[in-house]
Amino acid sequence: MKRNEPHPSLDGRLRRLLWSMLLLVCVILVATLAILLLHNHQYSIVTANIVRASQFNQNFKEDVDLKMYYYVIDSSYGETLPLQEVDEAKTLGQELLSGTQDRQSRKAITSAINLCENLRERIVQITETDGYEARMELLESNIYILTELIQQYFYTYLYHEAGYLDSLQAALTARLWLELGLVAVGALILVIVLMRRS
C-alpha cells in the first residue's frame, strides 16, 4: 500500500525557492569578497615590491664607479671599497625576488643579484691586482659595465612589476564585472520566479 504524502503548499515551495535563490546570491557575494581580498593581497605585495625597488640607490652606478676610481688611482678618497653598496643591492634584490610573481620581473631581479655577486668578485680582484694600468683596465672593462647592468636590471624589474600591477588591476575589474553580472542575473531570475508565482 502506497502512502499518500501531502504535496507541499505553494507557500512552502515559494519559501524554499526564495531561500535557495538567497543562498545563491550569498554564495556569489562571498565569492566576490574572497576574490577582492585575494586581489587586494596580490596588489599590496606588488605595490610593496615597487616601493622597495624604488629604494634602490638611484646613484648606485655613480657611487660605486667613483669609489672604485678613487681606489684605483690610489686617492685618499678611495680608502673605502663600495662593498656595502653592492651587498645592499644584492640583499634588496633577494628580498624582492622572494615576493615577485611575474616571470619577467623575476628574471630581471635574478640577473641583478647574479651581477652583484660578480661585481663583488671583480672589486676584490682589483684589490689583488698590482699596477695602475691593470687596475684601470679591470675598472673600465668590469666595474663600469657591471654597475650599468645592475642599474638597468633594477629599472627593468620596476618596469615589469608596474606592468604586472596593471594586469592585476585589469583582472580584478573584469572579475568584479562578472560577479556583478552574476548577482544581477540571479536577482532577475528571483524576481521573475516570484512574479510568476504570485
Residue spans of the language-model regions?
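Positive-inside N-terminal membrane-insertion signal
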Residues: M1-C26, A170-W177
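N-terminal membrane-sensor/transducer module of prokaryotic signaling receptors
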Residues: M1-D11, V51, Q55, Y144, ...
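Amphipathic alpha-helical segments and their boundaries
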Residues: L14-K67, S105-A108
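Long amphipathic alpha-helices with heptad-repeat character
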Residues: N40-Y43, A53, N57, K61, ...
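Secondary-structure edge/capping motif, primarily at the C-terminal ends of alpha-helices
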Residues: T47-I50, D63-G78, G93-T100, L119-E133, ...
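Short, solvent-exposed, charged loop/turn and helix-capping segments
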Residues: V86-L115
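Extracytoplasmic
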Residues: S111-N114, N118-A174
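Selective recognition of signaling/oligomerization transmembrane alpha-helices
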Residues: A162-S198
